[in-house]
C-alpha cells in the first residue's frame, strides 16, 4: 500500500464536512438502481477521510457498517488487508465525473499520491487515473457542467469474455446496451454506467481484493431474488434481513467471478 504523506493526513483530519447531500439515483421501472462498491482497506480511517476530502463524500455508519455516501452510489468499507489490488481482477476500476480533471489531479499529486495516465477519454473529455491506498484504481472524467463537484459515473469490467458478461448483466437486470463514447459494450443502470472491455488473459475474481464486490439496490428484494432463482441463478448468500445495519441482502457471483451484493435499504442511508 502506498503510504499517505503526513501533510495529507493533517489536511484530511481538519477538512470540513461537505455540505452537499448525496443519494442513490431513482430506480428504473424494475425497481433497480446502482447501490455501492465495497472495499477491503488496511486503514479505514484513512479511507474515510480521503473519500470525504477529495470526493465530497459523507460518512454514514450504521451498526458495524461504515459507508461513504456519494452522488449516485455508496462506498462501503471493511478494515481488512486486501489480497490484491483492483487491477488484475475482473473489476479493473470505477470512475467519477469531476468538474476539472487537471485541478483534481494537481491536488492529488500535491498530496504525494500516485497519478496514472492522463489522456482524452472515450467521450472526448480530459481523463486521468489516480491510485488510492490499497490498490483502489479510480478513473476521472471531466464534465464542466456537473452540478456537484464529483459524481459516480462508471464501473469497468475487464475480461476475455466481456461480450458474454455484458449479455449476462443485461439479461439478469433487464438492461439495454448503450455505447459510451467510443466504447460500444456498455449498459446503464440508474446512477452508473457499466462498461465491459477485453483482456488478453483471464482476470481474477474480486472477492477478497481491494474491491471485494459491487452492489445493486433493489425495491422488493425478496421478490427479485425469487425471480432470479426461477431463472436458475444460484446465490452465495440467500435473501436475509440484517437488522444491525438496516438492510435486506443477498449475494451472488457473476460468470466472470465478480461478487455481487443485492440490497434493499441503502437508499435510506
Give the positions of each predicted feature:
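Short, flexible, solvent-exposed loop/turn segments with mixed acidic/basic and small polar residues
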Residues: 5, 26-28, 81-86, 144-146, ...
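Bacterial N-terminal signal peptides
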Residues: 5-17
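Vicinal oxygen chelate
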Residues: 21-29, 32-43, 67, 83-157, 180-181, ...
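Core segments of cupin and vicinal oxygen chelate
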Residues: 29, 38-75, 80, 110, ...
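Ser/Thr/Gly/Pro-rich, low-complexity flexible regions
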Residues: 168-172, 214, 259
Amino acid at each position: 500500500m502506498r503510504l499517505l504523506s503526513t501533510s495529507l493526513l493533517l489536511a484530511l483530519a481538519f477538512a470540513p464536512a461537505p455540505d452537499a447531500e448525496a443519494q442513490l439515483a431513482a430506480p428504473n421501472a424494475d425497481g433497480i438502481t446502482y447501490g455501492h462498491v465495497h472495499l477491503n482497506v488496511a486503514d479505514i480511517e484513512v479511507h474515510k477521510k480521503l473519500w470525504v476530502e477529495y470526493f465530497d463524500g459523507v460518512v454514514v455508519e450504521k451498526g458495524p457498517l461504515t459507508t461513504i455516501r456519494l452522488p449516485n452510489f455508496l462506498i462501503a468499507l471493511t478494515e481488512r488487508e486486501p489480497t490484491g489490488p483492483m487491477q488484475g481482477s475482473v473489476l479493473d476500476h470505477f470512475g467519477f465525473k469531476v468538474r476539472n480533471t487537471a485541478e483534481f489531479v494537481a491536488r492529488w499529486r500535491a498530496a504525494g499520491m500516485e497519478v496514472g495516465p492522463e489522456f482524452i477519454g472515450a467521450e472526448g473529455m480530459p481523463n486521468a487515473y489516480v491510485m488510492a491506498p490499497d490498490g483502489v484504481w479510480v478513473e476521472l472524467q471531466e464534465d464542466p457542467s456537473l452540478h456537484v463537484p464529483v459524481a459516480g459515473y462508471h464501473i469497468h469490467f475487464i475480461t476475455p469474455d466481456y461480450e458474454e458478461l455484458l449479455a449476462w448483466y443485461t439479461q439478469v437486470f433487464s438492461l439495454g446496451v448503450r455505447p459510451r463514447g467510443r466504447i460500444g459494450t456498455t449498459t446503464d443502470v440508474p446512477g452508473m454506467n457499466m462498461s465491459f472491455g477485453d483482456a488478453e488473459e483471464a482476470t481474477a475474481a474480486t472477492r477478497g481484493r481491494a474491491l471485494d464486490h459491487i452492489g445493486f439496490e433493489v425495491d422488493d428484494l425478496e421478490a427479485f431474488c425469487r425471480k432470479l432463482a426461477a431463472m436458475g441463478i444460484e446465490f452465495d448468500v440467500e435473501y436475509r434481513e440484517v437488522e444491525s445495519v438496516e438492510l435486506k441482502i443477498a449475494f451472488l457471483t457473476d460468470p466472470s467471478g465478480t461478487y455481487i451484493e443485492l440490497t434493499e435499504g441503502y437508499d435510506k442511508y
